[in-house]
Amino acid sequence: MLFRSAEFLVKIDSMLERIRTERGSGSDFLDLKTGRGGIIEAEFVVQASQMRESIWEPKWQHAADLLQRRRVFTDAEATKLKQSYGFLRRCESVLRRYDNKAVSALPSDPNEQRKLSIRLGYDSFEIFHRDYVDARETIHVIYQRYVISTNRGAPSALQPFNLSEA
């Protein structure tokens, strides 16, 4: 079956890379949707896992729950994935409400980043930054484990998250 093949996962990863190239801002850190460990990566890992397991559930949260119940994701992975995805979606929602338009990246202005962290209820940008990086890393590690490692047949080495763009 195509959905169970390594070729399928290579196509998923290639599609994600194409989206990053075409829609990304050029700053992986700021790209909360298309960047490494971003919203789209979380959606792709769940959708690819759904296809492999023949789970046809359109709602991301319900699909993640079903994958957890079927033991595709461990309880810890599923919990962290859902928390991280929820965190990024909250960031997106707050940005969208403030800008009154679709938003796929954090603001590049440090003062606007600080304002975002306050709107999200943080006392400081540093604490928000830590949680943001943790959420992105969590999603990326899970994506690596279920899409990248699987399509190459061996565990892949993780590269450290580049914070120099922050």
Show where each model-derived region lies:
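A nucleotide- and high-energy phosphate-metabolite-utilizing enzyme signature
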Residues: 1-166
